[in-house]
Amino acid sequence: MAFITEIANEAQWKTEVLETPGTLQVVEVFQSWCGPCKAVQSTFKKLYFDLNDRPLKFYSVSSERLSSLKEYVGKCKPIFLFFKDGKQVEKIEGVKAPQLNRIVTELSGKNPPPAAPAAAPAAPAAEAS
């Protein structure tokens, strides 16, 4: 089973990353001329298996494939983007395994239970005559 999904197009990016609530998506943005970073593969694999009870997915995508990632085209270092509920919540430039471990572990924690609904206001007391 592959633990990293490669994003092929904008539609997949939208469906897999931007429209998946409650899951931390870790996205490695790489350049087509050098491919995904092999140095970080073991870190991701360990996190994938150590945190398999958490809502967590790993992706890789070439910056040249998506117009929404054009700001990363030509970068020499891999970029790691962290998304939750369709919003980018963190970014790391370069291979920094301890920082990747910490951020993934912190951000992939299970979502807290929803807040209890507020109690209905008490009915006004009846006036005594």
Curated annotation (Swiss-Prot):
Residues 2-109 form the Thioredoxin domain. Gene3D superfamilies: Glutaredoxin. It comes from the Eukaryota. Keywords: Cell projection, Cilium, Cytoplasm, Cytoskeleton, Disulfide bond, Dynein, Electron transport, Flagellum, Microtubule, Motor protein, Redox-active center, Transport. One of its GO terms (cellular component) is microtubule. PROSITE patterns: THIOREDOXIN_1 (PS00194), THIOREDOXIN_2 (PS51352). Disulfide bonds join 34-37. Residues 107-129 are annotated as: Disordered. SUPFAM superfamilies: Thioredoxin-like. Residues 117-129 have a biased composition (Low complexity). The keyword Transport applies. This is Dynein 14 kDa light chain, flagellar outer arm. It comes from Chlamydomonas reinhardtii.
